């Protein structure tokens, strides 16, 4: 498996917290700085409702083809966790190792971003989740996307706790943060000051964190 100079995993505390929006913002921000990027979605499951899939959105943001972002055989048109969608559609089960092995990066990519599915402990393959994949790909940084409002402290603590054993620094991004919302402000301060998480509230801050992190990871 080839590897970019810097490799990031974007994951979430739950489904629909805005992982794809954040990842697209990162890709746009990096490209605006002249950084060659590539995005990968190891597997995607989705409703057939006519809306663009995550892979299509990430492809548009990174200047790639959707099936370069997510291989065609990993598109599952059923709105459930990817391994469950595969089973529901009568398709072959797959492992975390197979997802990791299918990650193929263009030689020009200075930054590669992997967006996972669902929450940190949501099934990503028949034998694992985002934590499993992080152990396999050894990212240089993990970006945990969370809601800014009620319930986020518990969700971040549980998700970040599961990710910390992977060795990569975890940056918490509070999505949809409103500086005028007292609860959002208190949640950010609690996570940063009491729990000592690295918390950001804008995509611009995320771009800087990603570019500042040491690259290299584990190379083949």
What are these model-predicted stretches?
Residues 26, 116-196:
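Conserved catalytic-core segment of NTP-binding enzymes
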Residues 9-24:
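Glycine-rich phosphate-binding P-loop
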Residues 80, 192-211:
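Beta-strand-loop-alpha "switch" segments that mediate conformational coupling across diverse proteins
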Residues 5, 35-36, 106-110, 139:
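Short, high-confidence coil segments that cap the C-terminus of an alpha-helix
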Residues 6-10, 110-114, 142, 170:
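Generic beta-sheet signal
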Residues 1-8, 207-220:
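Short, low-complexity, intrinsically disordered N-terminal peptides in bacterial proteins
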Residues 5, 21-91:
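N-terminal phosphate/diphosphate-binding loop that engages ATP/GTP or pyrophosphate donors
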């Amino acid at each position: 498996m080839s590897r970019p100079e810097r490799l990031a995993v974007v994951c979430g505390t739950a489904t629909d917290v805005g992982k794809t929006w954040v990842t697209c913002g990162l890709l746009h921000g990096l490209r605006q700085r002249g950084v060659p990027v590539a995005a990968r979605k190891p597997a995607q499951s989705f409703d057939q409702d006519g809306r663009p899939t995550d892979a299509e959105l990430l492809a548009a943001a990174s200047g790639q083809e959707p099936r370069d972002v997510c291989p065609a055989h990993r598109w599952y048109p059923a709105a459930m966790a990817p391994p469950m969608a595969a089973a529901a559609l009568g398709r072959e089960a797959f492992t975390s190792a197979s997802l990791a092995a299918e990650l193929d990066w263009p030689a020009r990519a200075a930054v590669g971003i992997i967006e996972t599915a669902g929450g940190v402990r949501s099934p990503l393959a028949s034998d694992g989740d985002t934590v499993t994949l992080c152990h396999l790909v050894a990212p240089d940084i993990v970006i945990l996307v969370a809601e800014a409002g009620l319930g986020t402290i518990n969700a971040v603590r549980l998700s970040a706790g599961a990710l910390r054993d992977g060795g990569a620094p975890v940056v918490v991004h509070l999505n949809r943060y409103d500086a005028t919302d007292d609860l959002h402000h208190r949640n950010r301060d609690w996570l940063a000051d009491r729990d000592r998480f690295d918390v950001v509230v804008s995509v611009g801050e995320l771009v800087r964190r990603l570019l500042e992190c040491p690259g290299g990871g584990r190379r083949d």
